[in-house]
Regions:
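Conserved catalytic-core motifs of eukaryotic protein kinase domains, centered on the activation segment
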Residues: 66-74, 109-113, 158-159
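NAD(P)-dependent short-chain dehydrogenase/reductase
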Residues: 136-187
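SDR active-site strand-loop-helix element
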Residues: 7, 31, 56-60, 98-103, ...
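NAD(P)H-binding glycine-rich loop region in Rossmannoid oxidoreductase-like domains
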Residues: 41-79
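Adenosine-cofactor binding site in Rossmann-like domains, unifying the SAM/SAH pocket
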Residues: 22, 26-46
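N-terminal Rossmann NAD(P)H-binding glycine-rich loop of SDR-like oxidoreductase domains
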Residues: 2-23
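Catalytic helix-loop patch of NAD(P)-dependent Rossmann-fold dehydrogenases
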Residues: 78, 82-86, 106-148, 152-153
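NAD(P)-cofactor binding segment of oxidoreductase domains
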Residues: 70-99
Length: 187
């Protein structure tokens, strides 16, 4: 039986984590949204109770932050708040440590310096608000947890800004990108 469980295993971060654990020959159980619907509380509790992992990497998320404002607003909240709450409750019920992957969108972006771990949050969009609600659920439910706030995630697998720019540079003489965003790429 594996001591590690990964949600969101088919997303960019989950895929990277699975490959890293494979390279290190560390056993794990990994589930994408088709194998584990985190918005289904009963399914999550049953899966965790059956497997009893010691550590849960909660990588599952709704990440289309532009669509989270309107057409997918409800789905954003179902996955990022309700789903995270379900994972947190199931983790706590088996005494597992939870690692929650959050985002820099929990901040308003007005800080000119780096954000410190205890910096005040002030999300400006629905995605950031839902991810912050997920953080609050983890903090209030799970005894042993880590919250990791990432930005500009990229890696070998999945769609990401770095690979998009490399691909476009091969086919375009001139690229235009926004110049008002500041972030720290996360590999």
């Amino acid at each position: 039986m594996s001591k590690i469980l990964i949600t969101g295993a088919h997303g960019q971060l989950g895929t990277e984590l699975c490959h890293l654990l494979d390279e290190k020959e560390i056993a794990y159980d990994a589930f994408g949204s088709k194998e584990l619907d985190i918005t289904n509380q009963g399914q999550v509790k049953a899966k965790f109770a059956g497997l009893k992992p010691a550590v849960i990497f909660h990588c599952a998320a709704y990440t289309a932050f532009d669509k989270a404002e309107d057409e997918a607003k409800e789905l954003n909240w179902q996955v990022n708040e309700d789903g995270t709450k379900n994972v947190a409750e199931a983790a706590q019920s088996i005494g597992a440590t939870m690692v929650y992957i959050s985002t820099d969108y929990v901040f308003d972006g007005t800080n000119e310096d780096e954000y410190q771990v205890d910096a005040p949050t002030n999300p400006k969009n629905e995605y950031g608000k839902a991810k912050l609600a997920g953080e609050e659920a983890v903090k209030s439910i799970v005894d042993q947890y880590y919250i990791i706030r990432t930005s500009w995630v990229f890696g070998e697998y999945g769609k990401n800004f770095v690979y998009t720019m490399l691909r476009l540079a091969k086919t375009h003489d001139h690229l235009t990108v926004v110049d008002y965003q500041v972030g720290r790429p996360t590999w």
